[in-house]
Amino acid sequence: MNNQKSKELFQEAQKYLVGGVNSPVRAFKAVEADPIFIKKGKGCRIWDVDDNEYIDYVLSWGPLILGHAHDQVINAIKQISNYGTSFGAPTELEVEMAKAVIDAVKSVEMVRFVNSGTEATMSAIRLARGYTKRKKIIKFDGCYHGHGDSLLVSAGSGVATLGIPGTPGIPEELASLTIVLPYNNIEAVEEAFEKYGDDIACVIIEPVAGNMGVVAPSKEYHQKLREITRKYGALLIFDEVMTGFRLSYGGAQELYDIEPDLTTFGKVIGGGLPVGAYGGKGEIMEYVAPVGPVYQAGTLSGNPLAMAAGLTQLQLLKQLNPYQELNEKGRFLEEGFKKISQETGVPVVVNRVGSMITVFFTDKEVVDFATAKTSDTKKFAKFFRCMLEKGIYLPASQFEAFFLSTAHSQRDLEDTLNKAYECFKQLS
């Protein structure tokens, strides 16, 4: 496969963009490769600047559940752009989009649109602190909630200890307000609340983890979280930036029948444009300005292009109800990867929830970040490079999810598994 133009562009990009990219994972460092530069996409396929064609399982990291350049989504963007791109003022589209989100997600009574998932989680944390008048928050090791300072925090030594900065630039004093616990460990949550319960504002969690690779919650885990947070008067925040409108129309909370106090959204609700949102019970959301004292604002929040794309995608998802189809596609890939593993003798653990999948190169059950990290990242990197060479575009990290869309056909899935078999044979 010829990647000459991509290589040249990457060399040029590094002169002007930090690391040559605008988000670290795009640099392909974790898979020991140079990034490919994409020029177009359609359906489940993308093409790079060297005209190489790929079946895409990244889908812009999840938003494109209907595939690239869906005709109706593109037409909605084109049509609304004729009237302007941003007004910094209320529009009818914002109201319609809010109604669509509230109609879909039972726990959401009011919503506020922002420009990214990071903004959504930062704002939800601020709101939780303002509403409860408490300082500490709980997050889970391996769950990513954007790059806000309170959330980019690593676990301290031992269970229920205060967090430490996950990157230079975050003050230790701020990091210490975040308690980082192991995912799927309800005893650790109970211990943290026994120790700090009166000062814990909220628990924020990916209801299905996607940023350590796909890790499903253990049975009754969310129900226990709901009970504990209610007992201590803390808010439960579901970060559904990845899972919202992907695992079901009502998100992971519909799948697991749990109502959090606040929910954050992103990805799918923007149809591929920059959008985030946070919403929840009216009495909590009314603490947000201009009604309440918790300040949050944004120049481009609710901009008409993003609202048009997002609303069209949500309307299509409601109409098509593709979730059973997506789940069946996911199951086909899951079973295919497991069969390939058995036939080639390359040990993997395949975790899947709906249309989100991760193939972990380990022989240990993956239930949290510690077990995810038993994966052989060097072996994954070889697998990634082999698949890329064969025209299959996967996430450039062992610890990310593969995403499926309605545009992936049975033939695409079979082609992917055939090529995966060839790559596994090279690894065995």
Swiss-Prot record:
One of its GO terms (biological process) is protoporphyrinogen IX biosynthetic process. The modification N6-(pyridoxal phosphate)lysine is found at residue 267. Keywords: Cytoplasm, Isomerase, Porphyrin biosynthesis, Pyridoxal phosphate. HAMAP family: HemL_aminotrans_3. This is Glutamate-1-semialdehyde 2,1-aminomutase. PROSITE patterns: AA_TRANSFER_CLASS_3. It catalyses: (S)-4-amino-5-oxopentanoate = 5-aminolevulinate. GO terms for molecular function: glutamate-1-semialdehyde 2,1-aminomutase activity; pyridoxal phosphate binding; transaminase activity. Its EC number is 5.4.3.8. It is found in: Cytoplasm. The keyword Iron does not apply. One of its GO terms (cellular component) is cytoplasm. Gene3D superfamilies: Aspartate Aminotransferase, domain 1, Type I PLP-dependent aspartate aminotransferase-like (Major domain). Pathway: Porphyrin-containing compound metabolism; protoporphyrin-IX biosynthesis; 5-aminolevulinate from L-glutamyl-tRNA(Glu): step 2/2. Belongs to the class-III pyridoxal-phosphate-dependent aminotransferase family. HemL subfamily. Its cofactor is pyridoxal 5'-phosphate. Homodimer.
